[in-house]
Amino acid sequence: MEVERQVHTPLHSIHAIPNQHPIAIIPDGSQKRAKIDMMRRAHEAASQYDPSITQTSVGISNSIQNVLIANSNGLLVEDTRTYTRMRISAIATDGEHRQSGFRGPGAYAGTEFLENLNIEENARHAARIASTMVKAGYAPSGRLPVVIENGFGGVLFHEACGHGLESTAVAHGTSVFANKIGQQVASPLVTAI
């Protein structure tokens, strides 16, 4: 019995692919002073937002990843992925409680992303979250009706109930829904489609 086999000869060349994220300013050590100034601006904007802000933390990170992709059809391509991100954290205290706010804008871009970013607005956003949280009252507890919007609600439902409805868990009797066919397992107000 003869088996037919196909062998693909590698192309031995790297193909160029269109750059989806052109980099205007490649991140390197020459931008240290500019980055320090950007972080100082974020710190000042967050710190001055409200007297409850007692601490801030700001960081900038850049990563450059060189990727080589090859497949059995002889395709060989390379890609360079440059990512830039600013992380802004603010802590608010009221003497008894402590809350934090965070903002972390980033993009597949070079340092130009930071130059085009409204740093002060992002810093104030992080501070606003912390300040609002530290001044907020406690959420009501107990049984409450919940309405979940379409979209992300599906993810919430899956995490809350979906894993328990997976066939292997039900078949092995390890699911809370095992042996519940025909029985009510949630509020009569719950409808999952």
Pin down the residues of each PLM region.
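Active-site bordering "gate/hinge" segments
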Residues: 1-193
